[in-house]
Design a protein with these regions (language model features):
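Transmembrane alpha-helices and adjacent helix-loop boundaries
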Residues: 1-333, 337
Length: 338
């Protein structure tokens, strides 16, 4: 009987656990990338406050599903609602935040919305970190329940969680594929390419931009709720602009904007560099090993520069959309004259 080498076995188990955890995390961030792709890639909306919607969704779901606070905690709600209701509420909170931001800004120039989203993200993080009796301040929320955790063993739960996140990612992907391929999606692309022309064609561009912004915000809120129940604990310091906004933008840029498949591929590629770089810390020289987290930021920054210079359309270029009427005019041979 051949017995496996313990070192090889431990290495294999460790690699498997990391791979499952990596794919689970990337699935959540791919959902956020899909939402940003809807806003920016399809509609041309500059949302530099992605982390705000992600954070609001996470805290909303956590506060609704947690038990009442103990004497050592200080937060509102704690209603012990079912986790599925928490996910729905997280999506609703993200969409509501987008509506509140979009109403006064979407009628203005696009850079005003970008500035507003940055400011809102900073304000929300500051409120969560300093307000007494709201979300437990800097200590964060701990013991957030995990979906189906009571029905599976600890060793199997990582696989269950991966399947759940892949199902959620698939639902968001196919839903967005359907709506962006519909006339609604074509209007969004028309607004992105030339808003004045879309307006001249009789489209209420502000309304369409608001719809895309709110739907994208709701999807980001849903992803935040999934993240909260995946990690089991959240705190304001975990929701920084670098992790929650910069990395997501990089995923969309690398994968290819205006392309839902590209958003997912970009999440895999950028996620590999972002989450994989710390694994090589022990193999790096001392002066780099002690700066491994700065190194991964540099790596992601270099990815942006390289793609902007060499592959500006991303890994998967947006497919040109031509109406069937135009296609018939171009490719149908004219009938011969009598």
């Amino acid at each position: 009987m051949i017995t496996p080498d313990p070192i090889i076995l431990v290495t294999f188990i460790g690699a498997t656990n990391w791979g499952v955890g990596f794919l689970t995390t990337v699935a959540i961030f791919a959902i956020v990338a899909l939402a940003l792709n809807l806003q920016w890639g399809y509609t041309g909306i500059f949302n530099f406050g992605v982390v705000a919607f992600f954070m609001v969704g996470a805290y909303t779901s956590a506060l609704l599903t947690l038990p009442p606070p103990s004497k050592f905690e200080s937060h509102i709600l704690g209603l012990e609602l079912p986790i599925l209701m928490g996910w729905f509420a997280g999506a609703l909170a993200g969409g509501l935040l987008a509506l509140i931001i979009g109403l006064p800004t979407l009628r203005l120039r696009r850079d005003f919305l970008a500035i507003a989203t940055i400011g809102v993200a900073t304000i929300i993080r500051s409120i969560a970190n300093t307000t007494e009796g709201f979300v437990n301040r800097g200590s964060g929320l701990n013991g957030i329940p995990r979906f189906l955790n009571d029905f599976t063993s600890a060793s199997d739960y990582k696989w269950v969680l991966l399947v759940i996140m892949l199902i959620m990612l698939s639902a968001v992907y196919f839903g967005l594929q359907r709506v962006t391929a519909a006339p609604w999606g074509r209007v969004l692309r028309a607004i992105r390419d030339n808003e004045d022309t879309a307006m001249a064609a009789g489209k209420h561009t502000v309304s369409f931009r608001m719809q895309a912004f709110v739907l994208g915000g709701a999807i980001m809120g849903l992803a935040g709720a999934l993240w909260a129940h995946r990690t089991g604990s959240i705190s304001p310091t975990a929701f920084n602009d670098l992790f929650g906004t910069f990395v997501i933008w990089t995923m969309v840029m690398v994968g290819g904007s205006g392309n839902n498949k590209g958003a997912i591929i970009g999440a895999l590629v950028v996620g590999f560099f972002w989450f994989g770089t710390p694994l090589i810390q022990e193999d790096l020289p001392d002066f780099l090993g002690t700066r491994v987290f700065q190194l991964r930021e540099l790596t992601v920054g270099l990815l942006i520069v390289l793609f902007l210079l060499l592959q500006p359309h991303g890994l998967i270029r947006e497919k040109a959309q031509v109406s069937r009427f135009i296609t018939c005019l171009l490719y149908t041979s004219p009938s011969p004259r009598d």
